[in-house]
């Protein structure tokens, strides 16, 4: 039977000093011997998705102690990708994922915690904590802060549902008046919570449900709704139960690596493809699998993308549908339920809350459950009142969206498309693959060919787009923005948003070794691997070269013969794989440290220390 890890610091005469320090934190004689549970919070006033988390850590802590554990809270950092967007701040976003994972490991191992509750929400925080959980492999439960309500505004007599991306697009569209931009800006992000579309934060919180590490409803229950409080209360009790099951009953089925098995990763990726999740999830799923020593690669994603249909389209793919609408349609368990009916889910994977994910689907899918409690849970609606307070409203929809033919969630017989919402493309420009969010691509441009417009940085591309230098039919190529080349693999939300503002969203393509915001739509192809800084072919593209993109056949090719590419490669080897133009970019020691070990996107942009 495994001993509680915390006994290392709480038992024995030689630990008198450590016990003295524990007592100074409030522990009493009766607490020594109880499981010590780390409450891993990520509160910050910088991020709307985390601004309401300050008191939620202590809410969980009280429930842990009521269940017989000892709760000890600490905080990680949290970067707001939207605020960091469009300037050098974005260089820090992806590297912060590794810092978060490391900081959780440092705190939990240094203090010998027995288990943990991870309170995350936004883009890199959930992935960082997930990586840590799989690295540590101690009992863990995830509970996120929840999605923001969608913005609502009436413009020129017409009602619109809004999100962050609408504000960005409107600001760059010269046809939108200053007054309308102000109205959109003030309405786009009305409450606390992660941005309201199927962007990276919400995508990742949904995937923790599919992995089996969070409670049903975690990905879709609004941050403002009173129903979300139950998830935090249950997480506190659940984690103590999991700790006892592992340390006292030797039940290893509840450990993160047992729950998040290869089959569970397949379930999560099937969900991601079906719901048209952010392309960033591919990076994070690969990185999490790496930490858990799960053999899950781009080839697995490619295999799944060829058989899983797109069952839901949410903003940015469908601008009038947001997470509150997904919840009304039954949330993640109902999407998994539709996949399961099509034989696309592994039912036998264990979860932290149910014997198997199949059992959870049977109870929580609104099209098959007999529980009125479950159905009422998914009636939780937006309150429509701007607020930064969690659990502050109790609005309910009058009815649920159970229309699986034309509703927000479709059946496998009535998909939005037979091809899923994400696809892996390969070809001479991306030998190790690249990713496109097909759910956001108009059918008219699933096949596209055009001349390359080459830029050595995101900034240069933005200048050209806003300067009307990009024309319909062009393929915008942004390189040296990968994990190593950036460094930090910036998101390209501004270039894609500005293309849309210029009326080119369905007339141009954009490819990059960088990545995209979950708010990106259009023919935006990212994660090109190998990246330019690692000698990838994207570094050999020249102005005017024709690039062919064929999403149905999963190919992307540079129309240049092998002999010419070999000549260009020899020339580039001599020059060194770095931008041809000097960039005004301050790369600090911290960023250099990340770049020194960063791998390309096909490996999740994890650090390669040469130990595997």
Swiss-Prot record:
Entries under InterPro entries matching the protein: Dihydro-acid_dehy_C, DihydroxyA_deHydtase, DiOHA_6PGluconate_deHydtase_CS, ILV_EDD_C, ILV_EDD_N, IlvD/EDD_N
The molecular function GO annotations come to: 2 iron, 2 sulfur cluster binding; dihydroxy-acid dehydratase activity; magnesium ion binding
Q: Which cofactor does it need?
A: [2Fe-2S] cluster; Mg(2+)
Enzyme Commission code(s) on record = 4.2.1.9
User: How cofactor binds (record note)?
Assistant: Binds 1 [2Fe-2S] cluster per subunit. This cluster acts as a Lewis acid cofactor.
Swiss-Prot/TrEMBL catalytic activity: (2R)-2,3-dihydroxy-3-methylbutanoate = 3-methyl-2-oxobutanoate + H2O; (2R,3R)-2,3-dihydroxy-3-methylpentanoate = (S)-3-methyl-2-oxopentanoate + H2O
Binding locations of [2Fe-2S] cluster: 122, 195
Residues that bear N6-carboxylysine: 124
Q: What are the GO BP annotations of this UniProt entry?
A: isoleucine biosynthetic process; L-valine biosynthetic process
Q: Does the keyword Cell inner membrane apply?
A: no
The annotated active site, in chain numbering, is 517
> What's a Pfam family this protein contains?
ILVD_EDD_N
State the pathway, as annotated in the record. Answer: Amino-acid biosynthesis; L-isoleucine biosynthesis; L-isoleucine from 2-oxobutanoate: step 3/4; Amino-acid biosynthesis; L-valine biosynthesis; L-valine from pyruvate: step 3/4
Keywords attached to this Swiss-Prot or TrEMBL record, sorted alphabetically, are: 2Fe-2S, Amino-acid biosynthesis, Branched-chain amino acid biosynthesis, Iron, Iron-sulfur, Lyase, Magnesium, Metal-binding
Cellular component per GO, a single term = cytosol
Q: Which residues bind Mg(2+)?
A: 81, 123-124, 491
HAMAP family (UniProt xref): IlvD
What quaternary structure, including any partners, is listed in this protein's UniProt entry? Homodimer.
Record-stated family: Belongs to the IlvD/Edd family.
Q: What does this protein do?
A: Functions in the biosynthesis of branched-chain amino acids. Catalyzes the dehydration of (2R,3R)-2,3-dihydroxy-3-methylpentanoate (2,3-dihydroxy-3-methylvalerate) into 2-oxo-3-methylpentanoate (2-oxo-3-methylvalerate) and of (2R)-2,3-dihydroxy-3-methylbutanoate (2,3-dihydroxyisovalerate) into 2-oxo-3-methylbutanoate (2-oxoisovalerate), the penultimate precursor to L-isoleucine and L-valine, respectively.
Mind telling me what this protein is named? Answer: Dihydroxy-acid dehydratase
